Amino acid sequence: MKMKMMVRIYFVSLSLLLFHSYAIDIENEITEFFNKMRDTLPAKDSKWLNPVCMFGGTMNDMAALGEPFSAKCPPIEDSLLSHRYKDYVVKWERLEKNRRRQVSNKRVKHGDLWIANYTSKFSNRRYLCTVTTKNGDCVQGVVRSHVWKPSSCIPKTYELGTYDKYGIDLYCGILYANHYNNITWYKDNKEINIDDFKYSQAGKELIIHNPELEDSGRYDCYVHYDDVRIKNDIVVSRCKILTVIPSQDHRFKLILDPKINVTIGEPANITCSAVSTSLFVDDVLIEWENPSGWIIGLDFGVYSILTSRGGITEATLYFENVTEEYIGNTYTCRGHNYYFDKTLTTTVVLE
């Protein structure tokens, strides 16, 4: 009995030792990965890095003109590194050609870079952030910002009977800044009462319960921020055009010639089509599979291109240069949506 207990303790200790060694190897590989990333930085960025600090990556963040902008320090946001840093402070600096300047406190919120009103003068600026822990460990990252114009109104179509028990969710697409105070929603210019019966709110999403055709309309979300330098709230808006349609027929017909007539040394192609029964539904996905059953994408030699319009989805299989090895091969066209799955095959033959 004593011997069995000793053997068990030995194996448990060995397992813990192996796991610890494996974890150390993983951490070392992560560090090596970011060291290599540091080596690829342009000189105008790398010259400002502190050799004592670990490098934690770069981030290219999008910003909208006239709206708030925020960015996290890359190592804090990166899933490979974030677990290493818990209690820390973040210092932000703006990188210029021959100097770096500390970012003022008014442009930092909760440790993130914060610009209350992003204008063109901020575009393409580079920022260096340094994360320092209580133990004195430090890691640095580089952030660049670029202007991106948000869509004015994004259309969304919902078919009754699809996910009625979950409701229709509308996302307020404020992708450029966090730390907002609250969001108010309007339908057709009238403020929505969040009563948790017909309408509820979860973060940036409005959920419309018990969907019906009358829920169609224009939905605007107004995002309220605050800033110590501005008396009134900063307000940013996004728009959705919701169209609710009756339940549709999701059947479709798959069309494909059973033979591909080819000539050695020349290109060839064949198109597989899916025609939906309902013109309002465009939910069929088509994939080509090679003789081994693997999906064909943008491969060399043989590749497929997918297009969709007006209830008709097409996937064209292209052969850049037909060789003898293709003759006799059978390729499968698979069309499917949430409800149905269909396949047809075609064989390569010499003309």
Swiss-Prot record:
One GO CC annotation: extracellular region
Signal peptide coordinates: 1-23
One Pfam family from the record: Ig_2
Entry keyword annotation includes Signal: yes
Disulfide feature: C73-C129, C172-C221, C272-C333
UniProt xrefs under SMART domains: IG
GO biological process, one term: symbiont-mediated suppression of host innate immune response
Family from the record: Belongs to the interleukin-1 receptor family.
Subunit details: Interacts with host IFNA1.
Designated name of the protein: Soluble interferon alpha/beta receptor OPG204
Organism: Monkeypox virus
Upper classification of the organism: Viruses, Varidnaviria, Bamfordvirae, Nucleocytoviricota, Pokkesviricetes
Gene (UniProt): OPG204
